[in-house]
């Protein structure tokens, strides 16, 4: 009996990070914890699709319309994920996002605006979005997360890295939970996968599971 | 469990850099001591009709120096700058490449000018990272950190965490960004470019001067690998977002204050233990004032503080790393570098701006940076005592 109690105590103390919620936006559909919540099959334009998602989920955040495509995708995915646990958001939750193409759409827009010879002029409203970590800033502002923020770039989804870094943040006491994910958009091709990891019961935070869930 | 007591110590050593002041660390340190600056007046009609100030690397010298190294193949200007910066580290630590050694590359815009060419592939930061890591023969997947102007110093912090949590034993950390029309025109549109070389913390400051540079450092848990004359332990680090505005810093310095406070708590020191601050000091009104707020809140208003921006300009994703490398090299000689461009105090709160080279026993250095997206980073370095080795 004592041995069993000790076993549980030990497990509780050393509980690992698990995936407690996750959200996907891809192929004109929105999923929360694996359940389809919205579908706009046939909508091929990213801009119309993401506006449809914004309206469908009543996100009520007018700043959305000013954002570049990466921030629109990031704020939408994170809002759908976080609204469900709104009263329970840890202000110290870290944000760790990653992608391949940085913020290429707004970069191209800015580049085009400065490549027209004498006619060229840059727009501060575009320029301010020409860094991928602005997406982290937007999520932090909306949910008042004064926390660790980092944006990483890889050739493709890198579950091993996300596991290593998210686990280091909780292990070293930098945060108690981590909003993690992959957020990629290039013109009309997009894939957003965000999840929350925490030392609570949930889906095991493993490479195999992340590959399955993205 | 007391996390602090169980932490694996992590050290940095062998810092290097490539700037318009010099293509190695020694030339840069000597340049600062001689009062030379990397910023100069430039004329480039492609950027703007009027002359402008910027810290631009002499590409002829860069290409010539690079061609003396052994790297084969085609490399962009930024890739050459990064390889020049890590060449010595790669040679010195080749023996560690197969011992859980990673590489972190920090850059905000990488080869961004590739966007206006047909060679779109080189725009991707991972492409640049892979070229650099392949060139030195490192097989692990490169990690790119692109977190605005804190990237360079945050990269050291990420390396430390990944080592302390057992995933890696060593890291090569390299940062770099170019002086590009892309960024210059953007800051112009913000009216944030200074008409003269930037003047951090000065009353007459009117904005930033842009620059280009690369810098590198080796991060390891193996004390025996560090150079006897330059070894620092990373004793605390934190990066807290302001959650306030995407392009302006918090007026109260909240994120920076919390970052500094967390780093001090981790290091188990109070503000009086810090010998000097290598600050961000971009010379915009908002940034410098925000730093004054944060340092005062952290009881650091009497600690000597310096910004290196008037020497190198704002080098974006390289800045935090470059400034750490320079600050540690000065600390090796128990010197505090000067904060150039400061004549009349231009902040609403007191700060001890170190306006000339000062001899002082330097044991603990605080490096901070802040940037777009509300980002802030603070890292504390402590000089290794030689006989502990």
Name what the model sees in each region.
Chain A
Residues 3-214:
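Conserved "HGTGT" condensation-loop signature of ketosynthase/thiolase-family condensing enzymes
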């Amino acid at each position: 009996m004592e041995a069993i109690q000790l076993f549980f105590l030990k497990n509780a103390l050393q509980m690992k990070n698990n995936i407690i919620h996750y959200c996907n936006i891809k192929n004109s559909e929105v999923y929360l914890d694996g359940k389809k919540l919205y579908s706009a099959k046939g909508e091929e334009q990213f801009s119309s699709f993401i506006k449809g998602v914004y309206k469908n989920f009543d996100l009520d955040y007018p700043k959305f319309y000013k954002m570049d495509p990466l921030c629109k995708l990031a704020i939408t995915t994170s809002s759908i994920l976080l609204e469900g646990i709104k009263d329970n958001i840890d202000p110290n939750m870290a944000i760790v996002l990653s992608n391949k193409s940085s913020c290429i759409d707004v970069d191209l827009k800015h580049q085009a605006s400065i490549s027209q010879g004498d006619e060229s002029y840059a727009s501060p409203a575009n320029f301010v979005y020409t860094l991928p970590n602005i997406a982290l800033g937007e999520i932090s502002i909306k949910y008042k997360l004064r926390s660790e923020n980092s944006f990483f770039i890889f050739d493709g989804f890198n579950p091993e890295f996300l596991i290593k870094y998210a686990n280091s943040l909780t292990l070293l006491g930098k945060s108690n939970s981590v909003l993690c994910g992959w957020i990629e958009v290039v013109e009309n091709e997009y894939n957003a996968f965000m999840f929350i990891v925490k030392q609570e019961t949930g889906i095991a935070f493993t490479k195999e599971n992340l590959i399955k869930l993205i | 469990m007391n996390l602090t007591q169980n932490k694996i110590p992590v050290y940095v050593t062998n810092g290097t850099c490539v700037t318009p002041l010099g293509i190695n660390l020694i030339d840069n340190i000597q340049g600062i001591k001689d009062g030379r600056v990397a910023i100069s007046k430039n004329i480039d009609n492609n950027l703007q009709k009027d002359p402008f100030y910027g810290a631009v690397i002499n590409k002829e010298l860069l290409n010539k120096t690079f061609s003396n190294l052994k790297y084969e193949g085609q490399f962009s200007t930024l890739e050459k700058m990064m390889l020049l910066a890590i060449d010595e580290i790669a040679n010195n630590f080749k023996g560690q490449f197969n011992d859980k050694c990673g590489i972190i590359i920090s850059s905000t815009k990488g080869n961004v000018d590739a966007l206006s060419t047909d060679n779109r592939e080189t725009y991707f930061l991972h492409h640049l990272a892979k070229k650099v890591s392949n060139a030195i023969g490192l097989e692990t997947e490169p990690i790119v950190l692109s977190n605005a102007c804190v990237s360079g110093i945050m990269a050291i912090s990420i390396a430390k965490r990944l080592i302390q949590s057992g995933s890696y034993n060593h890291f090569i950390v390299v940062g770099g960004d170019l002086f590009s029309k892309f960024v210059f025109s953007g800051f112009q549109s913000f009216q944030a470019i200074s008409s003269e070389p930037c003047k951090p913390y000065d009353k007459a400051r009117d904005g930033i001067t842009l620059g280009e540079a690369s810098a590198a450092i080796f991060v390891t848990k193996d004390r025996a690998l560090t150079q006897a004359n330059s070894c620092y332990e990373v004793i605390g680090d934190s990066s807290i977002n302001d959650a306030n505005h995407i392009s302006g810093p918090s007026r109260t310095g909240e994120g920076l204050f919390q970052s500094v406070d967390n780093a001090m708590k981790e290091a188990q020191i109070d503000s009086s233990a810090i010998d000097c601050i290598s600050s961000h000091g971009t010379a915009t009104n908002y940034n410098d004032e925000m730093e004054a707020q944060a340092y005062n809140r952290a009881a650091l208003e009497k600690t000597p503080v310096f910004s290196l921006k008037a020497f190198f300009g704002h080098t974006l994703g390289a800045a935090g790393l470059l400034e750490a490398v320079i600050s540690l090299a000065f600390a090796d000689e128990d010197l505090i570098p000067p904060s150039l461009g400061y004549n009349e105090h231009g902040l609403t709160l007191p700060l001890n701006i170190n306006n000339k080279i000062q001899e002082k026993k330097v044991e603990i250095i605080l490096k901070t940076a802040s940037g777009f997206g509300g980002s802030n980073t603070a890292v504390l370095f402590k000089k290794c005592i030689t006989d502990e080795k």
